[in-house]
Amino acid sequence: MNSEILKKAIAVYGEEPQIRQCMEECAELISAIVDYAESDEADIDNIIEEEADVLITCKQVEIISKDYVLESADNEEIKAEDKKTICNYTIKVLAEFIKTLNKYLRGKELPKYEICYQISNILLQFDFFNALLKLDGVSDIEKQLNHKIKYKLDRLKERLEKSE
């Protein structure tokens, strides 16, 4: 992910608005996951788009919190876990992150590792969730996600260039 574009967006739009944007994107992904969990005809494109938004904004929050570099765990396999269990846990991880960001915005003192720890949980949970999508017959998730992230970063770059 192009950190320079993300750093410029933070500088142009501000830290708090970008953190709020991350909270909003998490909420939108929760909504998309709920739709997926409750329906056999979920909008996979919407899930991928919302996940891309969360990944981009989490990277911005990671940049804002500065001190930690996070690595996503590589999980190739997923046990035969229930779809609702994985969806519910993904929602829980995203909701916990929203609560942490809200505390941060209210000026509550948080250990530096807390935000980074939760971002790493989100990234790890995305590995499980994407594995579930694969088991459900969705192919090329990583390719679709990378394409969507590139599109969104290019669009952000254009907006930033226009604002100069």
Where are these regions (language model features)?
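Flexible "arm" and connector segments at domain edges
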Residues: 1-164
